[in-house]
Amino acid sequence: MNTINEITATYQRIAEEGRSELNKVQNKIYRIGSLRLLLFVAGIAGIIYFWSSGWIVLTGIIAVTLLPFILLIKYHNRLFHRKDYLEKKIAINEQELSALNYDTSSFEDGAEFIDPAHLYSYDLDVFGPHSLFQYINRTCTQLGKSLLANWLGTHLVNKKEIESRQEAIRELTSELNFRQEFRILGLLYKGKAADEDELKAWAKSPSAFRKNVFFRMLPLLAGGINILCIALAIAGIIPLTVFGILWLCFVFASFCFTSKITKMQAVYGKKLQILATYANLLRLIENQPMKSPILKEVREWIGDEKQTASHSIQRLSKLMNELDQRNNAYIYATLNGLFFWEIRKIIQIEGWKEQYASELPRWLTAIAHMDVLCSLATFAYNHPDYSYPIITTRSFSLRAASMGHPLMNRDKCVRNDIDIEKRPFFIIITGANMAGKSTYLRTVGINYLLACIGTPVCARSMELYPAQLITSLRTSDSLNDNESYFFAELKRLKLIIDKLQAGEEFFIILDEILKGTNSMDKQKGSLALIKQFMTLQANGIIATHDLMLGTLADIYPDDIHNYRFEADITGNELTFSYRLREGVAQNMNACFLMKKMGIAVTD
């Protein structure tokens, strides 16, 4: 197992190798650019100077200047592509170095997925700035980004599914080169959020040209007539001008379809770059050996060796690129006059669509799954000190040793344990302000979520039964719905009760129940709620300032345990250990802090 220092050294080495090669490529680009300019100037000057020397001399000048100039264009373009590739390679390794120091600002934060009504994601800061999503997200496609959000928002609750995903993540964790290659190729052209829907909609759209017999026959008819005219002209039966007149007629006839084809080309043209990206990603998946069942399944989604998905998509990309040649007026006139070339290309594209439309969604799904699994594997690779949880079938169980919050600096994070071994069972945590209650709840929630999506967790060890996670930590007012803070929380608690009564299994995390009412009412309601949880065989953690809730452990000695986070007052100073201790809190700090700030407090 690598250490953090070894992982840091690996990223530094790859970035440095990239910078070294990039410097060489940039020098080549400069030299080739200079050579192209020299050849172009020499060619033009030679043609002008030797214009009257005959076609043999001019042909020789073109052969030694302009032809090499054209050949160098292709090589120059390859160098620019390599430059883009190396810049992405350097960037992603520099980003990982920053991420190891908890700077994830360069990654997308998934703020568009924030949902205050979600069962747990809003409370646990799963999406948004400085979120779990931003910390994990290494997706290089919009497909993968959306799927990662989906996985974080709808975690697994099946033991076999979680263990299968763990196996896939373990396998990819050791494949650093594959993961980085996948990410680089995806980032070269990431596309936009609507690409997937637009491609699927196009795949389902009708084939207007291919379904029409007239359009299918037109290229064959025009081509046959032109060949016949050329043959007759060569035989001296008809003058060549007949062929020329027919050719012009076909060119003008093609104008009748120009508007419709231009609209179709505009749609296709937007997909060229993203299709090329998808083809590259699919080819990478096809060539990667897979061992775990999930990765083998992803591989099966993209076809067999005889007709691979990458080859099929590359063929479509080639057809669309050929259609783009109609923008060249000379090619447009020449080929359309010969055999209605653009109609032929549209028919070929529609033929591809009819052949592979049913396969396209599976191919896109394969890309998305591999993208997300690579993200999760990078998370595992960057945290060699994390452990994969043991998934149990014993309901309910949640045991973890030395558990910390993954977004907190590893050198400053105070780690604590948790131990729930039966159903029903609740942990009630009391403590002063700022003592660590809320952080502990989020630590438990985030690690529980990580375990249920198949990744390692920030703990020395963990064992859990995967029930549905639900929280109520930061209920807020809703001005749009005319809802008070208190009523919003009641709706949340009602949701939990209804689902428990329906027989659903939950792991519940609550912070300060019934915050929006007076102390006596709050206490009475909180006691009643927890008693109902016991009746419904529920499990969870509740943090509170209300020490009276600690008396519930006397009523349910086997089902409720008290823990606390203390604020220690020594002399005139307030200190926090952030260590979870057994029992009910002894010290509260509100009055102490008010006095420290000069606010009068009557003893």
Locate the predicted segments by residue.
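ATPase nucleotide-binding head domains, primarily ABC-like/P-loop NTPase cores
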Residues: 376, 382-603
